Amino acid sequence: MSVGADKIISNIKADAQAKADEIISKAKAESEKIIADGEAKAQIEKEQILDSANKQADMKYQQIISEAKVNSRRKELEAREELIEKAFRIASEKIEKLASENSANYVESLKVMIKDASIQVGSTQLEILVREDDVENVKSMIDEVSEYVTKETGNETSFVIGEPIDIIGGAVVKTVDGDVEVKNTIEARMLRYRKHLRSEVAKKLFR
């Protein structure tokens, strides 16, 4: 082979090698870029996943705290309600005891309750209903009550005592025909004033 041919072959090989090196270099650079891009993307996705996880964890934490506060408040209200109801039960039992003992204070209160109810009914012929234990009390005060109601209303008022009823104390006063009736029993009064009493009981229990 001549020197010229060797040189041509050598140049061809050199060009081929150069091109091969260039291709390899580009391939390597592209490969490195792909890897770098992949790592960057993976890092971004990782951060996004972590950020999402942190947000979910924070939301869950806030939800748990919120539910705990709500449950705590509900239990506190239930406990308060239980105490208030217990206070009412105790008060009711004490009032019932006072009524059963027929104390002077109770008899005076009974008289006031009958007077108030009679004026509210506003008729001249009234019927008084009380528990059996209070029938004698009413008999002893009926003249005084009649005189008081007559004076307050300006109308001559008479009373009859009806059949005993099942109540703790107090009285029901109604017209003899039953058209108008006022319940001034202990139970009815407690029910009427319950909202106000609840507020007062709560103040004393939880101040």
Curated annotation (Swiss-Prot):
It is a peripheral membrane protein. GO terms for cellular component: plasma membrane; proton-transporting two-sector ATPase complex, catalytic domain. Keywords: ATP synthesis, Cell membrane, Hydrogen ion transport, Ion transport, Membrane, Transport. The keyword Ion transport applies. GO terms for biological process: proton motive force-driven plasma membrane ATP synthesis. It comes from the Archaea. The keyword Ion transport applies. It is found in: Cell membrane. Coiled coil: none annotated. GO terms for molecular function: ATP binding; proton-transporting ATP synthase activity, rotational mechanism; proton-transporting ATPase activity, rotational mechanism. Pfam families: vATP-synt_E (PF01991). Has multiple subunits with at least A(3), B(3), C, D, E, F, H, I and proteolipid K(x). Component of the A-type ATP synthase that produces ATP from ADP in the presence of a proton gradient across the membrane. Belongs to the V-ATPase E subunit family. This is A-type ATP synthase subunit E. It comes from Methanosphaera stadtmanae (strain ATCC 43021 / DSM 3091 / JCM 11832 / MCB-3).
